[in-house]
Structures are given as structure tokens and as C-alpha cells.
């Protein structure tokens, strides 16, 4: 089977990591792959290391040649700009395409977006919430739920030891997310204010950068907090997962929350908000704790509960390990294979 994966993002974040993971697994299973990517993205350097055809396209209107997809069975779209590339390529050369949608925002009611989604042979959402949002806009389309799979990271014990020394004798809570409004960092800071008076040994480390950083830093100064540290974007997440005691993810909206899966895979207990696709991952009191979005008191209470209750921590770690089996890359790759094959079967019957 020959699949053309398209991801035109200029950066490299969760969606690109998940695309790369699927590509890597499919190569192991014997797929032939073509990848269309943005030359500005770090994603390209990773693809060049793999045994697949790479096409560089700086815009969805670029690189439309029959030779790119003439041997491909399906075009697989992985982000918002890529869908328009797939629409053009499909219209010109007749190759069907599917779309994986990773965010839980309502689909835009714009003519080009509607055309692009309407012409897709199948649509995929990572979570129940995303599937629901797709159905609202395109109720007649074939829609599948296929979650992303957790990425595993290497661990350098020397780096872990350095983190431990920096936060010695503290219960280390990490939030690993870009500093964007919907990621809920303001709720984290508000919770830190409550925790500072409650337990001086709990420390919150914010791993990520973004437009909200200055605002959040000012809030920390205003509250005179000594239990919050801004550490910027971190490239060695495996070391942080190994060093931390708890991961929190109090987003106001979230497609799925792949960082939660990554933390579970690293045997870290997790707390997340009851928003978007996060409840698809966290079964409250079993594989993690759920709190309502924007509720700083509930978040502070949950953090304190995990910090002070070792049996609960162990229970959540065990539950997390059991939960991630449902998100294993071999399993999710098999689900995509079923989608591809159904498209080929229907095409043969026409």
C-alpha cells in the first residue's frame, strides 16, 4: 500500500510528532510512503532520515504534479493547510484523501473549508469531542475515531539528576504545553497561589513558551509566588517525565492531550481538565484525576491530594499504564489500515 502523508505546518509540535510516529510505524509494516512537507519545518529533517519520498511544498498551492501521487492509493492529511493541498491534488489527479483532525474547535463555516472537508473520502477525529464537532458541520460524512499514540522519549540520568538537585526535597509538578490561553496556565498560577500557603514543598514548573508568558510572569510577581518556575521550551521531555512527580494539563479546550499519554507512558500520575478529548484518556480516580476547567481551587485540591497520598499516586500510575494500551501505535496504525482498505475496496467496486 502506498500512502501520501501531507503536513504543511511550519513548526514542530504534537501533530507533527504524531504524524512522524505513524509514518515510522507504517514503514516498519512495509508501506510505501510519500511525504509532502513544509521546507521550513523541523519535521523535514526527521523525514529525510527515513526511507520515503519527500516533496517540499511551502504553500498548499505548490507542488501539484501527477508524478507525486500517481502510485499512491490514498492521500492522508494531518493539519489544516494540508487539506487544501489534498483537495487540489485529488481534483486534478483523482487520488482520494482522508483528513485527521486533531483540534476540538468547531469547523469553520467558510466555503473553501466546506469544499475541502466535503470532498474528503473519510474524516478522522482523535477524540469523541472532535468527532462530535466534525459531525455538526458534516453530518453525512464517514467519520472515524482514531486516537493519537504516545511518543516515548529517551532518558539521560545525568540530566534527571540535575533536575532533582534543582528541585530537591520538593514535589515537582510539571505542565508541558505552549503558553497559549486555552492551555489553562492562568488556572495553574491561581492554583499555585492557593498551594503556596498550603504546602511549601509543592513546586510547579511550566515547560513551554508562547504569547502568554509575559502576562503569566507578571501574575506570578503580583502574587509573590515562589513555587512557580518558567523554564521555556524543553527538548528532552523524557528527562522531565522521569524527574517529575506529577503532570497537570488543565486546558480549557483540547483535541486529545497527547502529552498526558506521554506522561502515563513514563509512569507519571496525571491531572487534567474535564474538557475536549481529555476525558477520553483520563478515567477519573482510575487513570488520573479530572477537574473542571478554570477551577483553580479544584486543581489545587487535586494536586495536594496526589502529593500527599502515595497509595493514590501508585493507583493512578497503574491505571495510566493500563489505559495507554488502548493508544498503542500498533493498534492505531491498524485502525488507519482499515480505513485505507475500505477506501480501496469501495474504489474497486465502482
Where do the language-model regions lie?
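Nucleotide-activated donor-binding/catalytic signature segment of Leloir-type glycosyltransferases, i.e.
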Residues: 217-232
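A conserved mid-protein helix/loop that constitutes part of the nucleotide-sugar donor-binding site
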Residues: 13-24, 171, 178-194, 204-207, ...
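A conserved, positively charged/aromatic
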Residues: 69, 97-125, 137
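Short His-centered aromatic/hydrophobic patch
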Residues: 77-83, 104
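Aromatic "clamp/platform" in nucleotide-sugar-dependent glycosyltransferases that forms part
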Residues: 233, 252
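Short hydrophobic beta-strand element within catalytic cores of glycosyltransferases
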Residues: 36-37, 269-272, 282
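Donor nucleotide-sugar binding/catalytic pocket of nucleotide-sugar-dependent glycosyltransferases
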Residues: 55, 119-157
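Conserved acidic donor-binding segment of nucleotide-sugar-dependent glycosyltransferases
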Residues: 284-285, 289-296, 305-311, 325
